[in-house]
Amino acid sequence: MKQKALYYHEKGYNCSFVILKAGTEKYGIDLPEEAEQSCCAVSSGFGVGSICCALVGAVLLFGLLFSEEKAKTLRMQLFVLFHDKYESLNCCAISAHRQDCIEVIGDIAILTEELIEKNK
């Protein structure tokens, strides 16, 4: 999933979409064109430096793959794992000392895939 996410990022797609697209491809889910359009509004911490939108893409993927209850549990697990490494969930704080978010996107893809595989 990481390689696909980074591939789409290199092609210019935003953080939320690259995680969602890579995950739906890996797990055989048809993603409607409208999903890309909806993700256009979900980038750069919702435009105000808020929550990392790659995390949002992962949460959307959990919602497609699992029940509501399970998706919420996986969401919290992902947030804890991510926060342990980056000490924040905020786009502004995470990106402040980086030129780009390639490492962050890669890590989110890995964590997301690990959580999905453990809970299939």
What are these regions (language model features)?
Residues 44-62:
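Glycine/serine-rich anion-binding loops at beta->alpha junctions
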Residues 3-10, 41-50, 94-98:
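A short glycine/serine-rich beta->alpha loop
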Residues 19-23, 57-64, 108, 112:
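Buried hydrophobic packing segments
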Residues 15, 52, 91:
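Short cysteine clusters
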Residues 27-37, 63-77:
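Phosphate-handling active-site elements
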Residues 20-39, 83-88:
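Acidic-glycine-rich active-site phosphate/pyrophosphate-binding loop
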Residues 1-27:
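Active-site-proximal helix-loop elements at catalytic-domain edges
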Residues 74-120:
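C-terminal binding/interaction regions
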